[in-house]
Amino acid sequence: MNIMPMGNMKWMFHRGTPFHINGIFDPRNVASICGQYNSAVQVGMYDDCNIIYVFFHPYAMKMITGIPCHLFEDKNISMDDLGIPAFQLLKRMVLDAESDEKAIAYIEDFIIRQLAYRDRDSHLKQLMFVCDEINKHSFATLNQLADKACLSERQLRRIFLDNVGLSPKLMLRTRRCLRASKMIQDMTTKDFTQLTFELGFTDHSHMYKEFKQFAGMSPSEYFDHVNEIRRHHLIKGYKAYHG
């Protein structure tokens, strides 16, 4: 199953058998922090799969871990490897919880305590504003975002890499291709003309090149892939994962 980059970081807790990622199966990595990915990943699930995902706003992860987000880029790091006892304890509590509901309650309580413990970044409001602008406007440029945030482009890039894990330019491209994937998920025919126009790609060739870089397949191939997921009655969960 093809999982698109989304522009935000997440936690994964495997209360069943972990899935394999890009053909690699690591049974030890049952609780992890997933950094920002620059291209799609292929995952394979087992029958006893039981995963709790925790998705974060793009600017939120450093507020909880205290670790610069760019260090997680293209990585899926075990909570055991962070060297932070609180995360190691969280892992044990979540995996040993008597129910998913209890596990989720442990996670929520942990996040609240971490947020109360750590200082917020002085640029938090600007980060929130820029992330919101990126979500709303496919046509936004780096210069426009920096101007609206009252920052230089260099400042914005530095703050983004530290707190989001991507450059603002890469975030723009990631979100645009994610929106393209959502539109394709709802299509009934392979007509990508409207998609190209609505999302601000210069032409079909530009859209094809960008989409293939992030999705690992062409728009047409992705359309077929989504229909295969639909035939296996997994489309509801797939669409929910991608927001």
Predicted regions and their residues:
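Alpha-helical bundle regulatory/interaction domains
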Residues: 1-128, 133-137, 141-143, 149-153, ...
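Alpha-helical DNA-contacting segments of helix-turn-helix folds
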Residues: 121-125, 133-134, 160, 164-184, ...
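Basic/polar phosphate-binding segments, predominantly the helix-turn-helix DNA-binding elements
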Residues: 143-172, 196-218
